[in-house]
Amino acid sequence: MNARAESLPTVASDLISLTKPRLSSLVLVTAAGGMWLAPGHMGAVNALVTLLATAGTVGAANALNCYWERHSDQFMDRTRNRPLPSGRMEPAVALWFGISLAAVSLPALALGANVLTAALGLVALLSYVLAYTPLKARTSAAMLVGGVPGALPPLMGWTAVTNQMDVGGFSLFAIMFLWQMPHFIAIALFRKEEYRAAGLTSVPLERGDESSRAQVVLYLVALIPMTLLPFQLHIAGAWYLAAAVLLGLSFLGLGAWGFFRRLGNTWARQTFFFSLIYLTGLFAALALDRVPRE
């Protein structure tokens, strides 16, 4: 009995780790940002239920992803100690945990927000688990497919308030979609050999480092004008515009430096970490300089 009681915290910790809390928290911030920026009002209880249900949906997708990738995770330093590849948890537990979490979270999204937001959550879940995850072992285009569920949370936050998809919500979706590309290419560059050992493909493995660095620059060139849309749509004000331009040019400068100097893993890690600073700064500026709604 005592041994069983002592194991409960470990089991709980392992279940939580399946949801990838750090990734889920980042997604939750973007969903909350979409809710804050959307025109209209939402009650505090409904907003809380919506955010918790969004977190549950993301956690379910991550848990099912862990189930699917339990074999390849054994070959990567950052994943081999997860509950499934390490052998601490039976695969069936992770599978049913993910399914159960989704079964609770998606109806909660419909109740807390609306059916449209729940439908977007379902699209995010299915595209992440059934499309992006299996494609990772086959083609680098999986990155583009995975960009869709990764970009849906701010749109879900927007539709939770407005109950409609419009250009404002899609501008947030586009920003998140384009931001993910240099972010994930950077990871794939400095973890290239781990990807190879795990049997996964990526832009660097398929196209080479030079093409990968070039794609980072091209995606940043596309991202910068997209970040100006919230100002043009009167979602955010001039201070946001200044922050978006400054952050965008800084990010582009870092990308161009790596491309022209043909830099390697150190630059890729710097690009990865700056991408997190960039996204945090951009959404902070959006939140702080939100144009008041009447």
UniProtKB/Swiss-Prot annotation:
Q: Which GO terms describe its molecular function?
A: protoheme IX farnesyltransferase activity
One Pfam entry for this protein is UbiA
- GO CC annotations, alphabetized: plasma membrane
| Alphabetized Gene3D superfamilies for the sequence | UbiA prenyltransferase
- Report which superkingdom the organism of origin falls in: Bacteria
Where found, per UniProt? Cell inner membrane
Report membrane topology: Multi-pass membrane protein
Misc remark: Carbon 2 of the heme B porphyrin ring is defined according to the Fischer nomenclature.
Q: What does this protein do?
A: Converts heme B (protoheme IX) to heme O by substitution of the vinyl group on carbon 2 of heme B porphyrin ring with a hydroxyethyl farnesyl side group.
Name of the molecule in the record: Protoheme IX farnesyltransferase
Native organism: Myxococcus xanthus (strain DK1622)
Read off the lineage from the record. Bacteria, Pseudomonadati, Myxococcota, Myxococcia, Myxococcales
